Amino acid sequence: MEAPRPLHVLLVHVWYWPHVGGGNQHVEQIGRELVRRGHKVTVWCADVPAHEEKRFERGGVEVIRIPPSRVLNGVDPVVSIRGLNLSGVDVIHLHDTLPILIRRTLAKAKRAGKPVVTTFHNDYVKRTISGKLLKRVRWALQGRRTLHASDARIVLTPHFEGLLRKKGVRGDLDVIPNGFSPVEDSPVEPSALEGRDSSRPLLSFVGRLSEQKGVDVLMDAMDSYEGDPGFDLAIAGKGELSVWLEDRHGKANSKGIISVLGLVSDAEKRWLYENSTAVIIPSRFEGLPTVLLEAMNSGTPVVMADVNGLGGMVEQAGSGISVPREDYLSLASAMTEVAHADIETSSRWSSNGVATAQSYLWSSVTESVLGVYHRVVGD
C-alpha cells in the first residue's frame, strides 16, 4: 500500500510562542511532530505579545506573527490576513472557533477551496449575565458556524463531544486528546526552594497565573488552615494575576510555607514534578491541561478540580483526588490528604498516573490527527 504523501499543514491559533499557555503548546507540539514525519508546517498567530521577529522558524515550523490593530476585551486581536495566501497549503487546522483570526482564515480557506479541520479546545466560563448572554449569541452566530463550516471537527475529551451535541453541533466529531512530551532537560531545583526543609511534603501549582487556573482558590485554601498544615506550597508560573499574587502572598496567613517562583524553566518544572508530593490543579475550566498529563507521567499524584469531566478522569485512572470546582475548603482538605497519604496510597496514585499518561504522548496523538488530515484531503 502506498504511503500517504507529505502535506503542507497550516496551523492557526491566536496565541503562539513566546506566549505562555496550554493552547499554544498544543499547537507547537503538533507542528513539531508533523515536521518530524516529513510534513511542512506553517503557523499563523497574532503578534501578542509583540515579538521582534514577525517571520521565523522554530522547531522546523514556519511561524508568521500578525500584528493586530487592537485587541478586543484583551483576548481577541483584530488582525488582517489579506497579505497572506494559501498557495501550496493542503489542509488548514484551526484551533478555536470564535476569534477574528480563526473566522477570517476559515473564510479565506473556503474561498480557496481548501479543507478545514477545527479543534474545539475549551468551553470558557462567563460569570455575569451580560457575559453569559454574549457567549450564547457569539456561539450561535460564530462558534457553531465555524464548526459546521469545517470539513472535520476534533474535541479533546468525550465530555466536550457531549457538550457540543447539546450545543447543537451536527456531523461527525473526532475525539483526539491533548498530548504531552516528557521534559527532556535534566532537573534543576528552583533557587527559591534551596534550603527548604526537604522532610516536609511539597505541593506544587504549575501554570498560568489567571482566574481560569484558580490561583485565587488555591490561596483561599491556604488561608483556611488555622495552623501549619504540615506541607509547603510552590507556585510556578506567570500571568495576569502575577501582581495580585505577589500582594496576596504578602498578606497570607501561611506566607512562610508558600514559595512564589515566577515562570520556571523546563528543567525547573521537571524538578517540581519529580520532587513534589502532589501537583494541585484548581482550575475553573479546562480542556485537557498539559500539566495534568506531565504530572501523571512523572508519577506525581494530582489534586484536580472536577471541571469538564477531568475530576472523573483522575478518579477513574486512580491517579489522585478530585475536588468540586471553586470549593476552597474541599481543596484544602484534599491537599492535606494527599500531602500526608501513606506510602501504599501514594505509590498506587503514582503508578496509575504513569500508566494512564502513556496513551497521551504526542507521537500517538499526532498520528490520530494525521489520520483526520488525510481523510479530509482525500488521500
Predicted regions and their residues:
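Nucleotide-sugar donor phosphate/pyrophosphate-binding loop at the beta->alpha transition
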Residues: 115, 125-145
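Carbohydrate-associated surface elements
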Residues: 159, 179
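Conserved donor-binding/catalytic core segment of Leloir-type glycosyltransferases
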Residues: 192-223, 318
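Nucleotide-activated donor-binding/catalytic signature segment of Leloir-type glycosyltransferases, i.e.
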Residues: 246-264
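Short alpha-helical donor nucleotide-sugar binding micro-motif in glycosyltransferases
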Residues: 263-264, 271-276
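Aromatic "clamp/platform" in nucleotide-sugar-dependent glycosyltransferases that forms part
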Residues: 284
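Short hydrophobic beta-strand element within catalytic cores of glycosyltransferases
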Residues: 301-305
